[in-house]
């Protein structure tokens, strides 16, 4: 048996996720595919691909076609499940209970004002877009063999307008 880390889903633990999540995660588990492999097949970033699975990102017609192919799901069924618009932001309780998701929340809670201050000094009065946005997760191993998570956020700077 291969030693693969595979994210699966217990839908009973996530009652706010769309129906498509259960279908996508079941096919992912059945095929033993990582988000990296699925993302490579559909031509998207791993995080963007996972966001489709959690109902937090809109799948294009091309995404649906390629997902149906790689996951072995009927195209018509998948098109029906994924053709609507995402209902973003309601999939996780607030504050988050999952330890990893809570750590991400905690980073913003602890460093949010510091991020804001530095960004304001670099860019002026405004905000970083979470719509014109990309993100990626990488793994780094230091000289001592310790693994480090490298999370990159890249958002368009939107200056406040004067009126």
Swiss-Prot record:
CDD domains: Cyanase_C (cd00559), HTH_XRE (cd00093). It comes from the Eukaryota. Keywords: Lyase. It catalyses: cyanate + hydrogencarbonate + 3 H(+) = NH4(+) + 2 CO2. The gene is CYN1. It is an enzyme of class 4 (lyase). Belongs to the cyanase family. SUPFAM superfamilies: Cyanase C-terminal domain, lambda repressor-like DNA-binding domains. The active site is at residues 103, 106, 129. Signal peptide: none annotated. Gene3D superfamilies: Cyanate lyase, C-terminal domain, lambda repressor-like DNA-binding domains. Catalyzes the reaction of cyanate with bicarbonate to produce ammonia and carbon dioxide. This is Cyanate hydratase. Its EC number is 4.2.1.104. HAMAP family: Cyanate_hydrat (MF_00535). One of its GO terms (biological process) is cyanate metabolic process. GO terms for molecular function: cyanate hydratase activity; DNA binding.
